[in-house]
Amino acid sequence: MSNKVHLGHTARKRFGQNFLTDENVINRIVGAISPDNDHVMVEIGPGLAALTEPVASGIDKLIVVELDKDLVERLKEHPVLKDKLEIHQGDALKFDFNQLVREDKQMKVFGNLPYNISTPLMFHLFEFAQHIENMHFMLQKEVVLRLSASPGTKAYGRLTVMAQYHCQVMPVLEVPPGCFTPPPKVDSAVVRLVPYKVKPWPCKDVDLLRNLTTTAFNMRRKTLRNNLKQLLSDEDFAVLGIDATLRPEQISVEQYVAMANHVFDRK
């Protein structure tokens, strides 16, 4: 049998499918997720239910968002899960997670995310951060390193700034390729993202912050003065106390927020 086939389902490259099969890793991830009935439990991309089954076993209801119609049909017929699942067939990148919000419950979101959409999906989820208690995702190890990076490192970039603006970022464990069917060509890791209830550095316009960081990191080797000349003058940098000759990866999240707020106040 092909190593792309697991439990009778062939992994689809266009959906970025790699199915988690290592029981020890699965148990450690479920322990980190800590399923309970006090939160709205949401899984993105349940696949062949490697995480779905153990998470659902200890709770009353689990909401899943799955794009693959064949996998949705399998879940609907699952002998154990079918009565516990609320299934939404569709693209998580376009899904309105506000429809899952309950007045008295925050969401816990988790999933083994397709690596080809993981970054845009996290940006999408940040829009619902005020309704989320925490998120646990299996990602490409490189992405977890970017999420948790410190200023002055190669991994530090736009994703780092936006993730750390919205959330505390904590790597949980590393997962080698052999834990999946088929094995991905890269190492994986699990990360915990905990949205801030109160932002340490409140931004007056998050869209402006996103655009400013995108512009700053478009040319990583050039200085802030060069990259942000359409937004900030030398006088602005002096007022902010930021050295305009620094490169974008040398600037902290707090400083990016200060720059965005300065541009906003000048409007």
From Swiss-Prot:
Keywords (A to Z) from UniProt: Cytoplasm, Methyltransferase, RNA-binding, rRNA processing, S-adenosyl-L-methionine, Transferase
Cell compartments where the protein resides: Cytoplasm
Listed InterPro entries: KsgA/Erm (IPR001737), rRNA_Ade_diMease-like_C (IPR023165), rRNA_Ade_Mease_Trfase_CS (IPR020596), rRNA_Ade_methylase_Trfase_N (IPR020598), rRNA_adenine_dimethylase (IPR011530), SAM-dependent_MTases_sf (IPR029063)
Domain of life: Bacteria
Gene Ontology MF terms: 16S rRNA (adenine(1518)-N(6)/adenine(1519)-N(6))-dimethyltransferase activity; RNA binding
Gene Ontology CC terms, in alphabetical order: cytosol
Catalytic activity: adenosine(1518)/adenosine(1519) in 16S rRNA + 4 S-adenosyl-L-methionine = N(6)-dimethyladenosine(1518)/N(6)-dimethyladenosine(1519) in 16S rRNA + 4 S-adenosyl-L-homocysteine + 4 H(+)
This enzyme's EC code(s): 2.1.1.182
Pfam families: RrnaAD (PF00398)
Binding locations of S-adenosyl-L-methionine: 18, 20, 45, 66, 91, 112
Function: Specifically dimethylates two adjacent adenosines (A1518 and A1519) in the loop of a conserved hairpin near the 3'-end of 16S rRNA in the 30S particle. May play a critical role in biogenesis of 30S subunits.
Family statement drawn from the similarity comment of this UniProt entry: Belongs to the class I-like SAM-binding methyltransferase superfamily. rRNA adenine N(6)-methyltransferase family. RsmA subfamily.
Protein's recorded name: Ribosomal RNA small subunit methyltransferase A
Source organism (scientific name): Shewanella pealeana (strain ATCC 700345 / ANG-SQ1)
Record gene name: rsmA
